[in-house]
Amino acid sequence: FEKLWSKWLGVKYSVFVNSGSSANFLTMLAIKYLYGTGKVIVPPLTWNSDIVSVIKNDFKPVFVDINLNDLAMNNDEIIKKIDKNTKAVFLTHAQGFNGLTDKLINELKKRNIILIEDVCESHGAKHKNKKLGTFGFASNFSFYYAHHLSTIEGGMVCTNNKKFYETIKMLRGHGLLRECGNPSFENKIKKKI
């Protein structure tokens, strides 16, 4: 399922987890582990696990209000809230709407700020003919029974970053390195322990 999902979405790696909430939590934990903490810009209209995952992993949430036309954070206001301590933007694509603009994507790339896409309610939606969930450093999906695609429960973390992918696999597997499948990565982790 992970390989099929990656191919359908258009990313290199996908990791299936037990829920969209777990996808959010593991994403923030992996970012904390790999890059440290800081501020994360978040929307007030999202599922609570987006915000809880930020707080529980020692990041500081910074709220930006939504647009009424797409229910996503106002992209211009996101850019205004960015400061030297901003680590990431956790953007929710709500109800099948695209919450991205080229201006935001380019600004985040220019400033080297991580974009996390919550695509739990927008499977298959697009920005400029490219599926949502492929623009950021990571994207999270939910397969809860009330969402567009259901596995009854379940979630997915998607990325093109191999180091992040291996970290997510390790964290999903209770911290066991056997999940990684990369001896070089495993040795680096063992040296840290």
Please name every model-derived segment.
Residues 122-128, 135-193:
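Active-site region of PLP-dependent enzymes
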Residues 2-6, 28-29, 52, 79, ...:
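Solvent-exposed, non-membrane alpha-helical residues enriched in polar/charged side chains
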Residues 16, 42, 157:
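Conserved SAM-binding loop
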Residues 32-110, 114-119, 126:
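PLP-dependent aminotransferase-like
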Residues 1-39, 53-55, 63-65:
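Phosphate-binding glycine-rich loop
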Residues 81, 131-134:
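Active-site nucleotide-sugar/metal-binding loop of Leloir-type enzymes
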